[in-house]
């Protein structure tokens, strides 16, 4: 997982607080601590290199608690249809197929209302059921939706990957960074107990 590429396709930046775009922030980018735009798409060069080397190219969907203003995960769940599907999920599938990248890294680092957790699961399942890859970040927990980094794969985050009732929700999880060797082993064991291959579904590493 890396944050350093820039999209060539534009980012949604609704409700960006103008107060943050002051003279200092504009003239000295070291002061620009905030980051707006919830959707970051990999550019064509990034995707091309990834595919040439047998790797996936995935976009990022990022919600955090301190720098997204009025942009929240609830935007993803808008307009639910009578059949229970979500228009935004279909649009994300369309975007990925059009630009030729493989899927999305869902970085939900702000709390999810517990009442919305089942809908969020259904939203992601709708995407993977159409062949688009989803990787979940070890952040919002199940079933209450609060952010609590587990640093391992366990019962608090595994339903975001494999739900006992709904089945597969996403393809993999990327663990938060404060893990140990024992935690990684426990993560692998937990994945196997769910019938998941940890080599393909449980990732850990560093942030660049």
Short names for language-model regions:
Residues 65, 197-208:
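Active-site clefts of carbohydrate-active enzymes
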Residues 187-193, 197-201:
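Long, acidic/polar, low-complexity amphipathic helices and coiled-coil-like
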Residues 1-186:
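Chitinase-like catalytic core of GlcNAc-active glycosidases
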